[in-house]
Amino acid sequence: MSANMHIFENPSALAEALADDVGARLAAAIAARGTASLAVSGGSTPKAFFRSLSRRELDWSKVTVTLVDERFVPPENDRSNHRLVADNLLKDGAAEARFVPLYQAAETAEAAAAIASGRTASLGAPLDVVVLGMGTDGHTASFFPGGTRLEEALDPTTPRGVITMEAEGAGEPRLTFTFSSLQDAGYLVLHIEGSGKKEVLAQAEASGDEAEMPIRAMLRRAASPLQIYWAP
């Protein structure tokens, strides 16, 4: 599937434009169905976007927010994506949104993934908006090169839902939506910043194995065109 590149002068301009575009998609979903779904990613890159989006005029009570992936850590942990979203997105008007976490207080990551799969099924499919990030190793979501369940995660026949992932570069065990859960979003975004990430993207767009740079799965096989938002 083709990708569309959206280039901005700086990260601030990107954050505002992405918030406008995502807000418009959510508003359209609410107008059409009465509800909207949004899955976002962690890391430092989306903080400004989250803050901009939280200020958009929407009927946030009709929006359900979840995460593309999460570490198997409780929300009070500094490395929790849940905490990042709570601190930066679920505030101002967006405090009215419903949030469905991937982390669950279970004995194991596998048990948490099973619970999260059940709870996130309430969002319906496809998701209205998915905002992905990308690491310097070419991972997206928790699709890490060398990941324990990477082949399963990227297999389009794997059912929608949340599975576990462990990898050398991942730190804690991860919980991640499968490729099948994300690839047909109504608006599928890759948000990256900096020259380094642009170089990684160029590598990913070249020939090579998806398992080496899993973002290639989204670039090549997503049902929705990948909307790439980049700023230096």
UniProtKB/Swiss-Prot annotation:
Keywords recorded for this protein, A-Z: Hydrolase
Gene Ontology biological process terms in this record: carbohydrate metabolic process; pentose-phosphate shunt
Q: Which CDD domains match?
A: 6PGL (cd01400)
Q: Which domain of life is it from?
A: Bacteria
Q: Which InterPro entries match?
A: 6-phosphogluconolactonase_DevB (IPR005900), Glc/Gal-6P_isomerase (IPR006148), NagB/RpiA_transferase-like (IPR037171), PGLS (IPR039104)
Among Pfam families, the record links this protein to: Glucosamine_iso
Q: What is this enzyme's catalytic activity, as reactions?
A: 6-phospho-D-glucono-1,5-lactone + H2O = 6-phospho-D-gluconate + H(+)
The EC number(s) this enzyme carries: 3.1.1.31
Biochemical pathway = Carbohydrate degradation; pentose phosphate pathway; D-ribulose 5-phosphate from D-glucose 6-phosphate (oxidative stage): step 2/3
Task: Provide the GO MF annotations for this entry.
Answer: 6-phosphogluconolactonase activity
Give the protein family: Belongs to the glucosamine/galactosamine-6-phosphate isomerase family. 6-phosphogluconolactonase subfamily.
Please explain the role this protein plays, according to its UniProt record: Hydrolysis of 6-phosphogluconolactone to 6-phosphogluconate.
Descriptive protein name: 6-phosphogluconolactonase
Organism per entry = Rhizobium meliloti (strain 1021)
